[in-house]
């Protein structure tokens, strides 16, 4: 083995040891979403509505106790990525913040005062990593099915899957790395939701029907 190859082998070994050392304990993360200050989305173009949000956990039962796996330098799972807040609550709070930032009001379903009802089936909220030779590729994913109903007659106005994905490269995967990609996936999901043509058309329909009542 020449000197250059030997150095590469040593560096790869050190990298593997470093990754392994960081992977032995559970990671605790606090994902969340805060609307960008001073910025509104296309949701603001819709007349203010009273909206009820329901989020149901439809994730794979084998993933419901965590939001990711930590791995050692050889790709073996060694610990869990645990969220301090239930993922359904994280998504509910994010949607609530986005609607309120765009002049809409969130109401409880049982109050029966909603102009529109938004039902979310959370399919996956996950952080993952792929180990390459000298870096780690971190990935966050949020998959959900959405349904928008008229709050008065429960008529379905939109139904579709939506996704938010975020990737970044790092040298080491500490707790902040997992939280970062989970936040990124949540941000991308909310961004996609608030700009989706079907979502906007459904809410505009509700606003028009409200004006006629």
Predicted stretch roles:
Residues 1-10:
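Bacterial N-terminal signal peptides that target proteins for export
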Residues 10-20:
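Bacterial N-terminal signal peptides
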Residues 22-89, 198-213:
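A structural "domain/chain start" motif
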Residues 72-86, 152-199:
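Short secondary-structure boundary motifs at beta->alpha junctions and helix caps
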Residues 54-60, 121-127, 163-165:
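Generic short beta-strand segments
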């Amino acid at each position: 083995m020449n000197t250059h190859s030997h150095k590469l082998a040593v560096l790869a070994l050190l990298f593997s040891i470093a990754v392994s050392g960081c992977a032995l304990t559970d990671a605790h993360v606090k994902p969340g979403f805060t609307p960008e200050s001073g910025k509104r989305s296309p949701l603001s173009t819709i007349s203010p509505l009273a909206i009820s949000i329901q989020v149901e956990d439809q994730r794979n039962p084998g993933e419901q106790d965590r939001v990711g796996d930590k791995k050692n330098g050889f790709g073996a799972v060694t610990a869990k990525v645990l969220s301090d807040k239930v993922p359904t609550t994280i998504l509910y709070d994010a949607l609530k913040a986005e609607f309120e930032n765009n002049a809409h009001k969130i109401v409880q379903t049982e109050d029966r005062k909603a102009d529109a009802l938004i039902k979310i089936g959370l399919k996956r909220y996950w952080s993952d990593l792929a180990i390459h030779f000298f870096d780690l590729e971190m990935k966050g994913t949020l998959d959900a099915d959405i349904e928008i109903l008229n709050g008065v007659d429960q008529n379905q106005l939109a139904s579709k899957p939506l996704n938010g994905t975020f990737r970044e490269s790092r040298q080491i995967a500490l707790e902040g790395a997992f939280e970062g990609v989970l936040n990124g996936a949540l941000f991308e999901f909310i961004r996609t939701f608030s700009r989706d043509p079907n979502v906007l058309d459904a809410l505009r329909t509700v606003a028009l029907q409200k004006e006629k009542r």
